[in-house]
Amino acid sequence: MSSQKSSHHKADSKMEQDNNRKAWISQPSGLNFVWGGDSRYWVIPKEPRMPAELKMVSWLEVTGSFDKIEPGKTYRIGFKISFKPDATGWDKAPVFMSAKIGKKGKTVWKRIKSVSQNFGILKGGSEPVNIPDESDGLFEILVSPTALNQDTKLQFGLYEVWTGRWKTGLLIHEAFVQEV
């Protein structure tokens, strides 16, 4: 039986604790990328601390999970991104983040307007930025205090799947989860 390579990249590492930032960090190899298994669309680095590079997609879906959460606590979720100077397709792209607790949890969505609003500045070679930024407001999710014996894995993602437009040049440096 032959093994067939997937068109998608499945996370292959766990989140690491960053005590300085009081956060848990996922490098690109620890995230799931739709179309990430195909080098025509994404370059997923094998080396730590290197960003994943979007070559081109019309369906952006990058997801991760975190299982070290505690009932009754609130968690802040975000991504650190930048753009290549020749990036395209982001000026009118409605980028969203989502989060939910457990497979059956209610999904919470947040539009990340700062990506399209600041695209011209971001693709000018600036340093990586956290999204959502202050203009978007923080993205936080509360784990129910009664969730003790339930599935409490935090699942989160970054999406732009609605326009069908091609997007290029996004660099994803990391995803992070911070206890508030």
Curated annotation (Swiss-Prot):
Region Disordered: list its residue ranges. 1-21
What residue spans carry the Basic and acidic residues bias annotation? 9-21
Give GO terms: molecular function aspect only: carbohydrate binding
What Pfam families would the database entry show?
Answer: PP2
PANTHER family registered for this protein in UniProt: F-BOX DOMAIN-CONTAINING PROTEIN, PROTEIN PHLOEM PROTEIN 2-LIKE A9
- Descriptive protein name: Protein PHLOEM PROTEIN 2-LIKE A9
Q: Provide the species name.
A: Arabidopsis thaliana
Gene symbol here is PP2A9
